Amino acid sequence: MFVKTGDKVKVISGKDKGKEGTIIKAMPKEGRVVVEGINTIKKHVKPNAQNPNGGIVDTEASIDASNVMLIDPSNNEATRVGYKVVDGKKVRVSKKTGESIDK
């Protein structure tokens, strides 16, 4: 998967198109990601230890990883991701600038 937890991404399709956020959770086997503040849903929750009253809670649902683009840290623009082998390690590279994304 081309994105990791903690990466800043831009949504490129769907109801939240154009919004930016940070990846909270990446699910490579399903090909999905959860982005902070994106694709929020209202969930009915029974009373429990964390939420003694229960009620309706806003939470983020996952979206397909193909619907997000990584934001290049060097110029803060959305970019496609390529890969290069540097010192025997596979690193992610911005297609726009050619710079390494992984530090």
UniProtKB/Swiss-Prot annotation:
GO terms for biological process: translation. InterPro entries: KOW (IPR005824), Rib_uL2_dom2 (IPR014722), Ribosomal_uL24 (IPR003256), Ribosomal_uL24_CS (IPR005825), Ribosomal_uL24_KOW (IPR041988), Translation_prot_SH3-like_sf (IPR008991). Coiled coil: none annotated. GO terms for cellular component: ribonucleoprotein complex; ribosome. One of two assembly initiator proteins, it binds directly to the 5'-end of the 23S rRNA, where it nucleates assembly of the 50S subunit. NCBIfam families: rplX_bact. This is Large ribosomal subunit protein uL24.
